[in-house]
Amino acid sequence: MKVKVVDALGFSYIFKTLSQYVSEATLLFGNDGFKVKGMDPSKVVYIDIFVPKDYFEEYNLENEMKIGVSLKDVNEVIKNVSKEDILYLELEKDKIMFTLDGEYLRTFSLPVLSPDEVETPSINLEFPFRANILTSTFGDLLDEFDQIGGDSIRFKAQNGKLYLSVMGDMGESIVELSLENGGLLESTGTDAESLYGLEHVSNTTKMRRPSDTLEIAFGSQLPLKLRYNLPKGGYADFYIAPRSE
């Protein structure tokens, strides 16, 4: 197995984001592309990421491969990746090789862990409200909310508008996003309102680097679904369980 990633920096943020929730991950290289799933220890956040085969500059695979890795080790390898770097992933016996080809060539070998089967929850939800937003807009808003000091974020849909609010030590911050003010790219559905953990939501925003747009879907006392759209039809889905009022 050997794959080549031209946008090594963007791809690295998949691992950086995953490590916010889990310590180990099973990487699945299949005929259609790269997949990884995970659930945080508290079972609040379920993650489902797919990067299609066409995303990769090269994708050489004889058989489907499942490779367990320590995300701490992977992030140590890729922490200094630059936008000029090209990344190669290659499996050699019981090692996975990370090669970064940029200003100079560096190769790292990491031990392969036994792959774990992630308990996949049954997700068959009809979300009353959906909206699309630029990931840069969403990320900037969450950065501001983090400074307020609250631990929960309220998502409220009303008359096609989306309101995000956080109550913290500095008071309450409310942001209105709509088609009219340019905060939303698309908006559809009915009124809904629910509360989620701010840290769980904020930790997803590292995906703003490889993703341009984000779909937000939720309902009253339903999980929040955040879909970061990736190139070539890929996606990074985060399902976050609601908090009780």
Swiss-Prot record:
GO molecular function, one term: DNA polymerase processivity factor activity
GO biological process: leading strand elongation; regulation of DNA replication
Keyword vocabulary terms for this entry: DNA replication, DNA-binding
Domain of life: Archaea
Xref: PROSITE patterns: PCNA_1 (PS01251)
CDD domains linked to this entry: PCNA (cd00577)
Subunit structure: Homotrimer. The subunits circularize to form a toroid; DNA passes through its center. Replication factor C (RFC) is required to load the toroid on the DNA.
Task performed by this protein: Sliding clamp subunit that acts as a moving platform for DNA processing. Responsible for tethering the catalytic subunit of DNA polymerase and other proteins to DNA during high-speed replication.
Sequence similarity: Belongs to the PCNA family.
NCBIfam families: PRK01115.1-3 (NF002220)
Protein name stated in the entry: DNA polymerase sliding clamp 2
Organism: Sulfolobus acidocaldarius (strain ATCC 33909 / DSM 639 / JCM 8929 / NBRC 15157 / NCIMB 11770)
Gene: pcn2
